[in-house]
């Protein structure tokens, strides 16, 4: 695959100027936090190490912002150390334009750990996740557009644009539960990302239709 070589450069890209950790809040505000620089650990930081540390972080912190800020360094540590993860993905489906490969599945395990690919030019719906989330870009370029709720008496699901951000390999973005965004793979390369999500509240997860100022659960 022509895009497989792109993900191998992630650990180097993460050290370069310009890469960053981003956080999108429920209010549609985007801010940078922490450092994108991380050294390879002296011993291999395996997936089970990451999952153990992830459980500890979730037990320690209860709010979305604190959880994202605590977990992003763990994600960077994992991706720098366990190179095999950067190759564990499926090519996008010709029908949908995207593909998902789960990295860890266990009976009643509540979190989602997966690799996601999008073919160039494929957009997502405008949506929130109903839980906190973290996306680390490994290959390609991904445009993120952001919104916030702007409820009106007759249109409780009205939203308004708050900006956009272009993610490059080495960038990581986190979301709070009601942060609203849409993504699109741009350029010539398939977008490859490591995605991590908390426990989804399906009663709070929506895709939005700004033209009609409506939304629906999904």
Question: Where would I find each of the regions flagged by the language model?
Answer:
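N-terminal leader/capping segments at the start of a protein or of a new domain
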Residues: 2-83
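A short glycine-rich, His/Asp/Glu-containing loop-to-beta-strand
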Residues: 91-120
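Conserved short histidine dyad/triad with adjacent acidic residue
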Residues: 114-128, 176-178
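Residue-level recognition of short, solvent-exposed, well-ordered loop/turn junctions
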Residues: 119, 138, 166-168
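Short beta-strand segments in beta-sandwich/barrel cores
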Residues: 123-124, 140-146
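Glycine- and acidic-residue-biased ligand/ion/polar-headgroup-sensing regions
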Residues: 131-143
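A short hydrophobic beta-strand segment most commonly corresponding to one strand
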Residues: 134-136, 182, 188-204
